[in-house]
């Protein structure tokens, strides 16, 4: 148990040490006027929240309709599809949104197909980011892009992203090549 606590503390402090300090985080509950800017496939990443251990690493979800996110938020919940307004309602959270530069109509159709195929899984931290047996928030988001790009033989997607990592943290998604930050202000 002592080693598990030490491991969690080390992961907590190292999981996002290389994040660009200039990244423009937007207060989550103030971007109501940005809802029209979201598109299917946009990745939403919430900042870390130190008071809640479930949020120590941040949180990630993906837009699955123009007004709804899809996510695996916590143990016992499985897949949840929720209104983005409700998802952003937390007062003390900040958000960054990312968009894949090559998200065209063909990619979108296959992406939504993969969303539907991966809805009925259980939440579980897995050390195989390529597995679709279980999902956790950021691995689910990454896996959707990985699977869709693989299905379409997309040469623009970095299949070797975090190649040697067993876990994809929410903040890791901020480093995905060919994704741009969406201005939410």
What are these regions (language model features)?
Residues 2-9:
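Sec-dependent signal peptide recognition
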Residues 9-17:
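Hydrophobic h-region of N-terminal signal peptides that target proteins for export
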Residues 17-23, 127-185:
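Activation targets extended, charge/polar-rich intrinsically disordered C-terminal tails
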Residues 29-37:
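Short, surface-exposed secondary-structure edge patches
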Residues 38-42, 58, 108-112, 138, ...:
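Extracytoplasmic/secreted envelope proteins and their assembly/folding machinery
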Residues 38-101, 123-132:
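Glycine-rich catalytic cores of cysteine/serine-nucleophile enzymes that process amide/ester linkages
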Residues 49, 116-120, 142-150:
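Sec-exported extracytoplasmic/periplasmic mature domains
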Residues 93, 101-120:
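A structural motif
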């Amino acid at each position: 148990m002592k080693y598990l606590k030490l491991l969690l503390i080390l992961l907590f402090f190292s999981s996002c040490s290389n994040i660009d300090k200039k990244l423009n985080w937007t207060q989550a509950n103030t971007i109501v006027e940005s809802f029209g800017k979201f598109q299917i496939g946009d990745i939403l990443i919430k900042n870390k929240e130190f008071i809640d251990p479930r949020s120590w690493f941040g949180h990630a979800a993906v837009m699955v309709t123009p007004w709804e996110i899809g996510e695996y938020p916590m143990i016992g919940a499985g897949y949840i599809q929720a209104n983005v307004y409700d998802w952003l309602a937390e007062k003390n959270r900040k958000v960054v949104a990312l968009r894949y530069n090559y998200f065209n109509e063909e990619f979108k159709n296959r992406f939504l197909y993969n969303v539907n195929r991966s809805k009925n899984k259980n939440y579980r931290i897995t050390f195989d980011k390529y597995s679709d047996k279980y999902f956790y928030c950021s691995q689910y988001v990454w896996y959707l892009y990985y699977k869709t790009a693989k299905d379409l033989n997309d040469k623009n997607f970095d299949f070797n992203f975090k190649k040697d990592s067993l876990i994809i943290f929410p903040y890791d998604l901020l480093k995905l090549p060919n994704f741009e930050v969406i201005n939410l202000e």
